[in-house]
Curated annotation (Swiss-Prot):
Organism per entry: Helicobacter pylori (strain HPAG1)
Family named by the database record: Belongs to the carbon-nitrogen hydrolase superfamily. Aliphatic amidase family.
Annotated protein name in UniProt: Formamidase
UniProt-listed PROSITE patterns: CN_HYDROLASE
Domain of life, source organism: Bacteria
Length: 334
């Protein structure tokens, strides 16, 4: 629900705030430190303005920005955990909130490119979820593909949280993976520019509907002298309808009430359109228990490491050379 009720904590469920953080202009390590201070200040201000809020979400690239000339340099990378995430943890502990934060994480293997990483911190100041972006926005992004799968953790108000990062949300299988592992509130943090504004909104809704779960999504907002970032934080109900839709304003705080138990109840009680169940029990009316093998070729091929499109050999772009990245793999841009 999005209304004047979104100012306070609901009796059941929880109140979430998604921050349309202004796209940072980052040219030095001092700029990153300034962003961290700004994020922490905003977290405390949001809690003061919305005393009932229990989860505060910041978008992708809000910590380190999108300076593509420098974003792989050692100066711009963080360790997770590290002193910067400790600062976020202390802020969550002081404000007594859950927080979602974006980092570009130094790869423990110095021969490989960094990870694009999201963390969830609880009100005790503990990192309870760490996720590395599984699907970087190729061919633009140089991040190493994530290796932590799609983790799920306990959140406020009976929620089970998962986080995806920007382009991850365009991959329906990833939302299904989160739901399959019990997620009922799927968070998406993004740094998209306006080229995919409509598709971002569409997939936030479809990810909710296909999996009977809430989605909470927030994007950077503003202009960085190259692109405009559209903001438009969005909270979707488990039936795929939009409960709250932000605007294009930097610093806009998009709030809404979420009732995870309602999503859980739909998963338990719906017959029609309980599609996450039907996938693994197709035709259960005619065949008791249903057919458990969906018979989908791409799933079998993907599991066997043999995924290949019929047109793959004729594709024009399959590496990052169009954006100046080397094609040899390994660590570059130190």
């Amino acid at each position: 629900m999005g209304s004047i009720g979104s100012m306070g904590k609901p009796i059941e469920g929880f109140l979430v705030a998604a921050i349309q953080f202004p796209v940072p202009i980052v040219n030095s390590r001092k700029d990153i430190d300034h962003n961290i201070e700004s994020i922490i200040r905003t977290l405390h201000a949001t809690k003061a303005g919305y005393p009932g809020v229990e989860l505060i979400i910041f978008p992708e690239y809000s910590t380190q920005g999108l300076n593509t000339a420098k974003w792989l340099s050692e100066e711009f990378l963080l360790d997770v955990p590290g002193k910067e995430t400790e600062a976020y943890a202390q802020a969550c502990k002081e404000a007594k909130v859950y927080g979602v934060f974006s980092t570009m994480e130094r790869n423990p293997d110095s021969n490989k490119n960094p990870y694009n990483t999201a963390i969830i911190i609880n009100p005790q100041g503990e990192i309870i979820l760490k996720y590395r972006k599984l699907f970087p926005w190729n061919p633009i992004e140089p991040w190493y593909p994530g290796d932590l799968g799609m983790p799920v953790c306990e959140g406020p108000g009976g929620s089970k949280l998962a986080v995806c990062i920007c382009h991850d949300g365009m991959i329906p299988e990833l939302a299904r993976e989160a739901a399959y592992k019990g997620c009922n509130v799927y968070i998406r943090i993004s740094g998209y520019s306006t080229q995919v504004n409509d598709q971002w909104i569409l997939t936030n809704r479809s990810n909710a509907w296909h999996n009977l779960m809430y989605t909470v999504s927030v994007n950077l907002a503003g202009y960085d002298n190259v692109f405009y970032y559209f903001g438009e934080g969005q909270i979707c109900n488990f039936d795929g309808t939009t409960l709250v839709q932000g605007h294009r304003n930097p610093w806009e705080i998009v709030t809404g009430e979420i009732y995870p138990k309602m999503a859980d109840n739909a998963r338990l009680s719906w017959g029609l359109e309980n599609n996450i169940y039907n996938l693994g029990h197709r035709g259960y009316v005619a065949k008791p228990g249903g057919e458990h093998d969906a018979g989908l070729t791409y799933i079998k091929d993907l599991a066997a490491g043999k995924y290949k499109l019929p047109w793959e050999d004729h594709m024009k772009i399959k590496d990052g050379s169009i954006y100046g990245y080397p094609t040899t793999g390994g660590r570059f841009g130190k």
